[in-house]
UniProtKB/Swiss-Prot annotation:
Family designation: Belongs to the elongation factor P family.
Metabolic or biological pathway: Protein biosynthesis; polypeptide chain elongation
Name of the protein described by the UniProt record: Elongation factor P 1
HAMAP family in alphabetical order: EF_P
Keywords assigned by UniProt, alphabetized: Cytoplasm, Elongation factor, Protein biosynthesis
Cellular compartments annotated: Cytoplasm
SUPFAM superfamilies: Nucleic acid-binding proteins, Translation proteins SH3-like domain
GO terms of biological process kind: peptide biosynthetic process
Gene3D superfamilies: 2.30.30.30, Nucleic acid-binding proteins (2.40.50.140)
Amino acid sequence: MVLSSQLSVGMFISTKDGLYKVVAVSKVTGNKGESFIKASLKAADSDVIVERNFKIGQEIKEAQFESRNLEYLYIEDENFLFLDLGNYEKIYISKEIMKDNFLFLKAGVTVSAMVYDDVVFSIELPHFLELMVSKTDFPGDSLLITGGTKKALLETGVEITVPPFVEIGDIIKIDTRTCEYIQRV
């Protein structure tokens, strides 16, 4: 439990209405001199933002997330199947929770999942992954001389920009945060 005056941006709290992330917090003094804490809260399972007022000194339950390592197995009926490497249970994760992370997934990739009450709320990919190039544009002679770039389609279906010397079948290292080519492996 934390006191309302200890709320800070980025903190997760649990209320009777659900799980929320604090996105803004301020102390407000009312007309009669009574102060309260005004917080903007984003629902953890959607993009809905609500405003809540808390009395000064009110106790609020802070949500304690658990980080788990999950190994991606395959996709099944619009859900992604993972294996929890801690207890070897299978976990299904929806496309909504995956967001754009699924663009880089291939079997065997280990991700970090933020879990609360045995429910996965977010997935974080490794910052760097090694993926195979399955298709590239043909670089013209002028592109090779000037050191330009070309498009490459990776084995997971994502398209990125690569240097002209990258060919089909090459394994390349990419930054999953920026979707940029790092190096040929």
